[in-house]
Each structure stands twice: as C-alpha cells, then as structure tokens.
A protein has these predicted regions:
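A broadly conserved detector of short glycine/acidic/proline-rich loop/turn motifs that flank catalytic sites
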Residues: 134, 141, 187, 194, ...
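Catalytic donor/gating beta->alpha subdomain of glycosyltransferases that bind UDP-sugars
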Residues: 1-8, 34-37, 41-102, 193
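A general beta-strand register signal
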Residues: 182-185, 189
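Membrane-proximal intrinsically disordered regions of secretory-pathway and membrane-system proteins
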Residues: 62, 190-218
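Membrane-embedded multi-pass helical conduit in multi-pass membrane proteins
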Residues: 105-182
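Short coil/turn segments at secondary-structure boundaries
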Residues: 13-15, 100-105
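Long helical/loop segments within the catalytic core of UDP-sugar-dependent glycosyltransferases
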Residues: 1-40, 84-85, 91, 157-168, ...
Length: 218
C-alpha cells in the first residue's frame, strides 16, 4: 500500500531533485561486471546497499535508468509490528542516504495536518474547504498511481488511506531519530555515512559480511 502510493512517487521526485537517477532500489538490479568494478564493487555492510550501489555507479560517470517493468513482491504474513519495524528501518535508511532532504519530507503529510487543523479551528468553513481540497488531491494522486502500476486490487483498500497517512507520519517521526534498525532477527547500529554494525548486549561488533572488491570481479 505504502510502496505504491508513496515510495514510487518519492523515487520519481528524487529523480527530479537530483536532475537524474542517482540511486538504485529494489531486489533486482542489472549492470555489467565492468561497471560494478568501476563503482568499487559490492559493499554489503552498508544500510541501503542497493541505493548506495546506484549512487556509486552514478558517481563513476554512468547513467542509471529505472525499468519500465514493475516486479511484484510480497512481504508475507507480517504482523502490524513487523511491518512498522520494517518501515522504520526503511525510513532510517532514507535518512542516512539522503541526509537533510529526509527532514524536508515534513511537508508531505498535508492530509494529516488538515484533519488536525479542523479540530484546532473548530471546523470553520475555510478549514473545511482546505481539508476537502487536500484530500481530493491526495485521492487523485493515489488513483493515478493505481492506474500506472496496474494494481486494481488495492482499490478496495482506499478507505484506509487516512489511517495509512497517520501511520506514515508516525514512522517518519520515528525514523528521524536513532541509529538502530532491526533486520532479520538482530539489531544493527548505523554509523558514519551508513556503515552497519551488529549490536548485542549493549555492545557493537562489525557485521561479518565481506565486500567484493574490484580484483574479485572478473
């Protein structure tokens, strides 16, 4: 739900802000071994390794293209708490990779702010009009996304969009602070520009994942 309505549009907005695609996302990335070598090889011990790989490839002078194909993915039977911890991990990944731009996302929750405005203003006419306009724009954006990604089954969930937006704001706030993420049954601490270390019993240790350098890529 959040991936279709928020993540895909945010990736396209990032393309506009950067002037080109300067990142990579997703479980499926395609490139040549020579390009990978020029970018410094695979570096797994980093939060958002897919994003970072695309960033380094762009810095090496190559162009990155978003595929016109959308791969379907299923996170399985997650509990609500598992979904929240996963999205907090994604939020902190974005924060460490995009820096101060992450905090600019505060303006992206107009639907939530309008509902709060209604309560604070006592429901005056101009607040009602502003709220209706904001929600019309939001639903129009969502319907466009549904058509573009060909996901008609999500139409039956449109009623939950207000709840999703409130949840998204909470996750954004949570992701704005802290250096710890939960991934595959363990806590990882993020340091520097995104290097991850395993955290256990109050201590941190290097994540035992080796990078693949240029010499190892044939």
């Amino acid at each position: 739900f959040g991936r279709c309505f928020d993540f895909i549009p945010s990736a396209l907005i990032a393309k506009v802000i950067d002037g080109a695609v300067r990142f990579a996302v997703g479980a499926t990335l395609v490139t040549r071994a020579s390009v990978l070598a020029d970018a410094g090889g695979l570096q797994f011990n980093r939060i958002g390794s897919d994003y970072n790989l695309g960033k380094r490839i762009a810095e090496a002078g190559y162009q990155i293209k978003l595929s016109h194909y959308i791969l379907e993915s299923d996170t399985g039977d997650e509990t609500l708490w598992e979904m929240i911890t996963r999205e907090v991990r994604w939020a902190r990944t974005i924060r460490f990779n995009r820096g101060r731009q992450y905090y600019g996302m505060v303006i992206c929750f107009g639907t939530v702010y309008c509902l709060l405005l209604l309560l604070m203003s006592g429901g005056v006419q101009w607040a009602i009009a502003l709220t209706l306009l904001t929600w019309l724009i939001r639903y129009f954006q969502v319907i466009i996304i549904l058509i573009c990604v060909k996901a008609p089954k999500l139409t039956s969930w449109l009623w939950s969009l207000p709840l999703r937006d409130f949840l998204s704001l909470g996750i954004w706030l949570w992701g704005a602070f802290g250096q710890q993420v939960f991934w595959r049954g363990r806590y990882l601490k993020i340091e520097g520009d995104g290097i991850i270390q395993e955290q256990a019993d109050g201590y941190t240790k290097d994540v035992k994942i080796n990078s693949v350098n240029k010499a190892q890529i044939k």
